[in-house]
Amino acid sequence: INDMAKGRFRLGVGTGWLEIEHDLYGIPFPDLKTRFEMLEESLIYIREALSGNDKGFQGKYYQLEQFPVEPAALQDIPIIIGGGGKVKTPTLAGKYSDEFNIYAGPKEILSNSISLFKEVAVEDGRDVSKLEITTACPPVVGLTQDRVGESLTAAAKALSQSEDEIANTWKEKSYLYGTPDEVAATLSMWQEVGIEAVYLQLLSLQEDNRNETIEVIKQAVELI
């Protein structure tokens, strides 16, 4: 995939969180502590495999016999570690990731997690300037207040929550919400704490809604 994408492929690795999804596929879903242990062990192996180590791997959870990892990637494949954990997630990201995708949240939480991520990276001898910090959230936005209201109604329906619940949660967690002016304030805060890019988790794939969301973001960026 990385070769076909001309080096644009990025590998996102995580603990898993949606238990029902694991149940449906018959995949074990151990407790969070165990899942984090499994994640770290898998990251150690993945790093070695991607760097050309064909000696196999022997760990507590994973045992892989010696085999060549072929075809080899044309270049390094960036690893993304993301989530909203305040300690373990930024710690693992600082050790192993090329991109820390911290889930959107209040400024203080973002700032603390990003600081820990950088501290761990430096302690591990990594060049922080070469590591990326991104975020992700589902936008509830519109070019006008009326359009924001329509987006809010659609989000409430998609997520099976009330409009008040959506509005309160989005504002409380500093997700992208509102008109371009309001969105610009959130983007400015993200920029201030060190976030460089955002992945938009679109709740509607209808072309008009998608295009309006993109236009809101464009106008917001111009206001910063």
Segment roles from a protein language model:
Residues 2-224:
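Active-site-adjacent structural elements that line small-molecule/cofactor binding pockets in enzymes
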